[in-house]
Amino acid sequence: SLHDALPILRCDADSINFMKGALCYSDWLTTVSPSYACELQMPFFGEGLDGIFRRRSNILSGILNGIDQGIWNPATDSMIPANFSPKDMSNKAECKRALQEELGLAQDPTRPLVVSIGRLTNQKGLGLVRYAMDGLMARGVQVAVLGTGDADQEEAFSYFSNTYGNPMCARIAFDNALSHRMYAGGDLLLMPSEFE
């Protein structure tokens, strides 16, 4: 009964935490990565529940996020302009050229093209990317960002795209087909994270 569970759910004299109850009564606890499972056991990341995560660490596991190679395989992907593989990279350059053209970037095979695809949220560590943007642009790097999220992040990347023009493109949208072309055409994948 709820009355019996109150001592477990209670955070302090005036409040209860149903998440605490879920953590205490669950048969298994999973998170988005093994490192985040460790971080949750620390006061800074545990949000007051770190003690429970430590006590229940024997049933706490992180399932590493990853890419489905059956769907995101450049050797077989029908959403990209040309297929390639680690053993035959000859068509990779065509994917980059086509992406540069689509995004309005200079079609220059010698310029590094950094792509970032994902949620534009503070937890993703985009503050560091924003801080480094001037330096990237000064070095002749092309940057392409695709995603949606927090309004301040969306505005910042739209600002960079408008300010820097040609070497910077921000598409504030969810576009699965474009994400395939960006993974295939980019030279470097930027996937920052503040934590997890």
Give names to the regions the model predicted.
Residues 1, 5-196:
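Catalytic cores of nucleotide-sugar-dependent glycosyltransferases that transfer UDP/GDP/TDP-activated
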